[in-house]
Amino acid sequence: MKVLVLNAGSSSLKCQYFIDEESIASVTIERIGEKESYTLLTYANEKREHTSTVKNHHDAIDTLFSLLKESHIITDVTELNAVGHRIVHGGPHFSRPTLINTEVIEQIRSLIPLAPLHNPSNLEGIEVIAKVYPALKQVAVFDTAFHQTMPEYAARYPLPYDLYEEAHVRRYGFHGTSHAYVAKEAAKILQQPLETLNLITLHLGNGASATAIKKGRSIDTSMGMTPLEGLMMGSRSGDIDPAIIPYLVRTQKIDVETIDSMLNKESGLKGVCGNNDMREIIDKMDEGDEKSRLALEMYVYRIKKYIGAYSATLGHVDALVFTGGIGEHAALVREMVCEGMEYTFGIILEKKKNDSAKQEASAIHSRESRTDILVIPTDEELEIVRQTEVIVSRLS
């Protein structure tokens, strides 16, 4: 099956082209709407880049398909079986991948207040393709869908009940496509059906989230109504006392919009040590920088708290899974997270295995560990392809 995976951002368009679940080519278009837009095509181990003027997402879609045809990657759009779209927020409506039609488009539009930075761009990509190539099947894959299996007591906030009914205030969770992918890969590695496994998955990148998976289903996750809740992240605060916000409004004369921007873009690792690149933070810590040390210790401590909470919730944990840019590449972070968990949780990391874990799935626990510890590179695009194929296959 030939599937194009599309991720439309506010000023960018990223796509990957798959044939039978094998990635063939990728195209990235950045700085859409600016005088000089940047386009990168990666195909057959070669990279072609150039600058041009891409005025809007309509132009970007035209550029994308022109590149694919000019490079003889496809001969015509009609040979595609479907386009799979990454949609950040599915709200309470979507718990699975969905074939896109007019009704689905309007439901995604209604969710813009829940994801004002992402859903409008995601929607624009859908609408441009629907207009230019109306016969091309499109499937929406939602970042929030995997977490729709959370029980009510985990998904609700202890706020007035009316806020849920009137404003849909509840926990939705994010990174669902990544957590779903690595959970399935963990089941393959463990040679057990996913429905029998209890897992804690840690997606650690610039954005970070933890998920408790019981018998293959998400029962809790660290991100909430927005991706701001939960773990300390690259530039997002994660969990804080909500009373800090009105306190800052009163005492520092900062408006809510400024605080919102601060919590999302100037907090987390960046807020504590001025840097959100974990490699540089570790290097500076080794050079004796105390703010970098503090930032890393805070980062690890908060991950440990979630592992402890989720271990109690799950009862027993078959595997702890690290993924995402930091989870896959920062051996020191993995070591610090697992340190001290031997007695209570039976989590014992083997340093040699951990230090040598590179670009492929690896088991990094010792023989004595009661819990498997896995490093699994995530592949959200492949997961979107697989979910898209399921929907399209049902139409045949």
UniProtKB/Swiss-Prot annotation:
Superkingdom field: Bacteria
Keywords: ATP-binding, Cytoplasm, Kinase, Magnesium, Metal-binding, Nucleotide-binding, Transferase
SUPFAM superfamilies: Actin-like ATPase domain (SSF53067)
Enzyme Commission code: 2.7.2.1
The keyword Repeat appears for this protein: no
Subcellular location: Cytoplasm
Co-factor note (free text): Mg(2+). Can also accept Mn(2+).
EC top class, as a word: transferase
InterPro entries in alphabetical order: Ac/propionate_kinase (IPR004372), Aliphatic_acid_kin_short-chain (IPR000890), Aliphatic_acid_kinase_CS (IPR023865), ATPase_NBD (IPR043129)
Binding residues for substrate: R86
Residues that coordinate or bind Mg(2+): N7, E380
Pfam families: Acetate_kinase
UniProt catalytic activity: acetate + ATP = acetyl phosphate + ADP
Site (Transition state stabilizer): H175, R236
One term under GO cellular component: cytoplasm
Function field: Catalyzes the formation of acetyl phosphate from acetate and ATP. Can also catalyze the reverse reaction.
HAMAP family, sorted: Acetate_kinase (MF_00020)
Quaternary state and interactors: Homodimer.
Name assigned to this protein: Acetate kinase
Natural source organism: Sulfurovum sp. (strain NBC37-1)
Gene field: ackA
